């Protein structure tokens, strides 16, 4: 008898876990992905600085579309990105955009990947992610290749299957053509030669 009562109680409690009438993502515990729109309805991520709100969820929406697991915010990666972007280094070309940080993996337990986005206006985390994801139109998963003359590496880093963590920073570098800059660092980093992102 006691076993039956406990079983009945568990069944009733289990049925109360989600509100079937609630709109997707409305407190039912999970993030909902609209595959057609490439959007995700999820709670904000703790740790994202002002101006970057939604960047992790934007990444995870795109990752869900290709069947790879979500990223989590990593304060250590965010600190690496923040320390770099605040230096406003543009020596490699110069291009009016912050250079990549060649030393970004120093002191971190894995190789660190990096995406950089710059805007002549005001950059945002979701705008940066949308720019990187826009490269997917040039990427061909079946041959793991990119159209000639096009860039796909930002997109492939966003969806890299072995990457599990992300940390980003936003800063405005005065005098740069694309001064409002978002830097995202990823661990473990992607774009490993000869490997497919997913």
Regions found by a protein language model. Give the residues of each.
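Sec-dependent bacterial lipoprotein signal peptides
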Residues: 1-14
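Short clusters of hydrophobic/aromatic residues that line enzyme substrate/ligand-binding pockets
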Residues: 71, 116, 158
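Residue-level detector of conserved, well-ordered beta-strand and adjacent loop positions
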Residues: 17, 35, 117, 169, ...
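Non-transmembrane alpha-helical segments in soluble domains
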Residues: 56, 60, 82-86, 117, ...
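A solvent-exposed, acidic/Ser-Thr-rich amphipathic alpha-helical stretch
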Residues: 103-119, 124-129
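Disulfide-stabilized extracellular recognition modules
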Residues: 120-198
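Ser/Thr-rich, Pro/Gly/Ala-heavy low-complexity intrinsically disordered linkers and tails
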Residues: 13-48
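Short, well-ordered surface patches within globular domains
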Residues: 47-112
């Amino acid at each position: 008898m006691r076993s039956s009562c406990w079983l009945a109680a568990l069944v009733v409690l289990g049925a109360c876990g989600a509100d079937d009438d609630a709109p997707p993502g409305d407190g039912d515990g999970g993030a909902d992905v609209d595959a057609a729109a490439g959007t995700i309805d999820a709670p904000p991520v703790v740790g994202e600085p002002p101006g970057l709100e939604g960047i992790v969820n934007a990444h995870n929406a795109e990752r869900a579309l290709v069947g790879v697991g979500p990223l989590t915010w990593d304060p250590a990666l965010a600190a690496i990105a923040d320390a770099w972007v605040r230096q406003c280094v543009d020596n490699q070309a110069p291009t009016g955009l912050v250079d990549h940080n060649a030393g970004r993996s120093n002191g971190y337990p894995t190789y660190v990947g990096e995406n950089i986005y710059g805007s002549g206006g005001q950059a945002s985390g979701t705008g940066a992610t949308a720019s990187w994801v826009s490269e997917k139109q040039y990427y061909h998963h079946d041959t793991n290749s990119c159209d000639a003359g096009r860039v796909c590496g930002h997109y492939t880093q966003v969806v890299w299957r072995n990457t599990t963590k992300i940390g980003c920073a936003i800063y405005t570098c005065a005098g740069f053509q694309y001064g409002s800059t978002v830097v995202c660092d990823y661990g473990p980093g992607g774009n490993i030669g000869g490997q497919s992102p997913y």
